[in-house]
Amino acid sequence: MAARKATQTPRERRVTKVLDAAQELFATRGYEATLVAEIAESASVAPATIYNYFSTKPNLLMELALRHVRAALPERRAFLKNLPENPLQGIEAFERLLAEQALRHLSRECWRTMMAAQIVEPRGRAARTGARLNDLIKRQYVQIIRTYQARGRLVADVDASTLSDLVVGVATMNFARFVCGPSGTIEDLLRIGLPHIALILRGLLLDKQSRPRRRIRME
């Protein structure tokens, strides 16, 4: 981290300071209660600098989310290289990892704000950033699905991209329901979403010893 900061340009260093300050204040005071002026004071920059770099407070929050996703990529890559043998268990474990990463640094309030910003300004920066985050997860799911197809554990004639869109769409809906609720744990989120994942995969799972087209009946 120190080496990376040493190679940053002055602008990049200011952006890092702003994001660090915002993360700390959002965690301790909450997103809505934190003013841009307070972030600027903590980061030792002018409020105008923050507006110049991010335009809006929601955009700053989206950039913070992007930074956390970039930091989380090595953990996801390690998981994708060592998937569980059972596809349902693998996807459930990946959903748990995504949930843990999402809530590790950003609160439910922050996630609600980001989702709302994408709806309010569908062509805005927040919406574009949200689409990038979603596309990344979809690509990772495509990799998971194709890996299980290559292992003979998922039917081969299902389009991996389409199945990925379905899984991510349902998971995103459930995450939105979760963060909009007054309280709850990651276990509560998984309790809501995992039955839907199991239903999506019904009839697509193959027994380890089966021929490629034989499907498991899920009770």
Predicted features by range, described:
Residues E12, T16, D20, E24, ...:
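Generic detection of well-ordered alpha-helical segments
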Residues K17, A21, L25-N59, E63, ...:
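Helix-turn-helix
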Residues L83, A102, Q118-E121, F178-P182:
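Secondary-structure edge/capping motif, primarily at the C-terminal ends of alpha-helices
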Residues E109, A127, A131, Q149-I197, ...:
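Hydrophobic/aromatic-rich alpha-helical bundle segments in the mid-to-C-terminal region
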Residues E63, R77-R108, A160-V167, L190-G193, ...:
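Hydrophobic alpha-helical connector segments
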Residues T28-E32, L83, R151:
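Short coil/turn segments at alpha/beta junctions that flank glycine-rich nucleotide-binding fingerprints
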Residues L88-G124, V142, V168, T172, ...:
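Helical hydrophobic small-molecule/effector-binding pocket
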Residues L73, E85, Q89, H105, ...:
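Amphipathic alpha-helical packing segments from all-alpha helical-bundle domains
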